[in-house]
Design a protein with these regions (language model features):
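C-terminal subdomain of the subtilisin-like protease fold in secreted/lumenal serine endopeptidases
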Residues: 5, 348-353, 429-430, 501-575
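Extracellular S/T/G-rich loop segment that most often corresponds to the catalytic His/Ser-adjacent loop
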Residues: 255-257, 420-499, 503
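Subtilisin-like serine protease catalytic core
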Residues: 122, 234-274, 280-335, 346, ...
Length: 575
């Protein structure tokens, strides 16, 4: 009797707690048969649901209740392929609107391993045990070959990145010895180009932990080194005055989630109007998370002393930017590429990749071994083939897309393809960003000594440009540092440039960024790189052919104002 009484008391209390929780979409994933051509099933995990079904909106259309099934805090949606297309999805209930998330109708989806499907390898890294991906040679029918291989080895095809001819298999193995033996056999198939094994490792570098600067940084000064506010003022005033017909743009951010309870994102609810800056993302529960900070630099709302994001700050002059935060699944690099393929097929023009990995055994500029975000040689060889296939596909099918990637925080070299991915790839469509910080010298902003190379930033000729690496999201907040936070400054600049002149190619974007760049560091002699060279040195061709220009040989520092000015000029100049 006492237990029944306690239960009756607790039920209304739990309902009251649920009612107090804000409505949030915490997870959205394709479920069921990922390869089927029929109706798609999507599973949502939602916080703050009360009794009954919420209204589900896909774009500007509500879904019929017959397409929505609820089980506890999970909603399952069934979508007919011909009737719906990729669009933001959000919920509405009891006067509340949830955060909007992006629901893609594209075909690239992979599975993450469960806790019982991973093991420790000889390098001490967590590796997937029974889930691998195969890259099929391009002249073969990928799905047919993957199914043939699966049938031959008793495996099952469970996921795919179809445009790249990549298919995920679940292997009938129980330990790493069996897995590695089967990988060797599958890799020897004539139709298989590579086998991709997923691994993960803890982040022990700068971005894996909150850093406290001594003395604390001044956020305005850090971004002033890249002329952040000057660029905002220029776009707000010059663009309307010169009647430049700016175009809306979609930006993809490869991150897990954004905390919509953080002040910078509390205003993003429900539908987003035309001409506004929109953020579509799953809800996280950490305001200091990597995804929240990276997205905040792009599109966070400012206030109460906290800096706002660049795209949001453009105000009414902006044509409308859609920032889509997406990672497909927690399946490592393979999921990052699957999400990137879907985003590009959904019309994203700029991709922000604030991630990268080192091979086990990579050494920094001081000769010490890099211990953060490392992967085994087996995993790196598969990732290299996967990334190469992605950039080949991008060049062939979407040559106008720009990928902006962080150089990394191992104090190592970005361009050594045997030790660092993806920044080592040489392609016009990949911009690599290093990190700098304000120096302690009282010099003019234009001086090369106004900033100094961030000690942990990766370096060398493959780094195209550098930007401020440290952020302080709130006046009393902790400081975060790393090239991950320099990268969205460049992404935002590139997005604004393309909104001004959508005809710019990736190679032209790189050229304008470097021609407009401020400098940092000493002049170099164009010999082999040493630890002082943050980026590729400024060349005479990037300074109107002036052989005695003082910028020559120095590293490039992002100048957001001048980059936008050159983008405006490029509309009238034919090269």
């Amino acid at each position: 009797m006492l237990r029944l009484l306690v239960l009756l008391i607790c039920l209304p209390l739990s309902a009251a707690v649920a009612a107090q929780q804000p409505l949030r979409i915490q997870q959205l994933q394709r479920c069921g048969d990922l390869l089927g051509e029929g109706p798609q099933r999507w599973c949502l995990r939602v916080q703050g649901l009360e009794q009954g079904k919420p209204a589900v909106w896909l774009g500007d259309q509500p879904l019929s209740e017959t397409h929505v099934v609820r089980q506890g805090d999970t909603l399952t949606l069934t979508l007919d392929p011909p009737r719906q297309r990729s669009a933001p999805l959000w919920l509405e209930a009891r006067g509340q609107r949830s955060n909007p998330v992006w629901l893609t109708r594209q075909r690239s989806h992979v599975l993450a391993a469960g806790p019982d499907e991973v093991a420790k390898n000889m390098d001490g890294l967590t590796t997937y045990l029974n889930l691998v991906s195969v890259l099929i040679e391009e002249h073969h029918d990928g799905l047919r070959q993957a199914q043939r291989i699966a049938d031959k080895y008793g495996a099952q095809v469970v996921g795919a990145i179809a445009p790249l001819n990549v298919y995920q298999l679940r292997l009938p193995v129980h330990d790493l010895v069996q897995r590695d033996a089967m990988i060797l056999r599958i890799g020897s198939e004539t139709s298989v180009d590579a086998v991709i094994v997923e691994e993960s490792a803890p982040e022990r570098g700068e971005e894996g932990a909150v850093q406290v600067a001594k003395p604390p940084i001044d956020q305005a000064q850090e971004w002033a080194a890249n002329r952040f506010m000057d660029a905002l003022y220029y776009y707000q005033r010059r663009i309307p005055a010169s009647k430049v017909p700016v175009k809306p743009l979609r930006i993809g951010v490869i991150e897990r989630a954004v905390d919509f309870d953080a002040p910078a994102f509390m205003a993003y609810r429900g539908a987003c109007g035309a001409g506004e800056t929109c953020v579509y993302a799953r809800d996280g529960d950490q305001a200091q998370s990597h995804g929240t900070q990276v997205t905040g630099i792009l599109a966070g709302r400012g206030g109460e002393g906290a800096p706002g994001g660049f795209l949001t700050g453009l105000g009414k002059a902006a044509p409308g930017f859609e920032v889509i935060v997406e990672r497909n699944a927690d399946a490592g690099i393979t999921a990052n590429i699957a999400a990137s393929v879907n985003l590009v097929e959904d019309g994203v023009r700029v991709l922000n990749w604030s991630w990268g990995i080192h091979r086990v055994g990579a050494r920094d500029v001081r000769g010490d071994e890099v211990d953060s975000l490392v992967r085994s040689g087996l995993a790196m060889s598969g990732y290299e083939e996967l990334l190469e296939e992605f950039f080949l596909w991008l060049r062939k099918a979407h040559p106008d897309v720009v990928v902006v990637n962080s150089a990394g925080n191992g104090a190592s070299w970005s361009g050594r393809d045997e030790y660092r991915l993806p920044s080592s790839f040489i392609t016009d469509q990949l911009l690599v960003v290093g990190g700098h910080q304000r120096s302690d010298q009282a010099v003019a902003l234009e001086s090369p000594t106004h900033v100094t190379k961030r000690r942990s930033s990766n370096v060398d000729m493959r780094v195209d440009i550098s930007a401020a690496a440290c952020i302080r999201p709130a006046p009393q907040g902790r400081v975060h540092c790393g090239t991950s936070y320099a990268t969205p400054l460049v992404t935002a600049t590139v997005a604004a440039m393309l909104s001004i002149n959508p005809q710019l190619t990736p190679d032209q974007v790189r050229m304008l960024l470097r021609r407009s760049a401020l400098t940092l560091g000493p002049q170099q002699d164009f010999e082999a790189m040493d630890a002082e060279d943050l980026t590729a040195p400024i060349l005479p061709s990037e300074r109107n052919g002036q052989l005695q220009h003082p910028d020559l040989g120095r590293s490039a520092r992002l100048d957001m104002l001048r980059a936008l000015d050159l983008a405006v000029q490029s509309r009238e100049r034919v090269r």
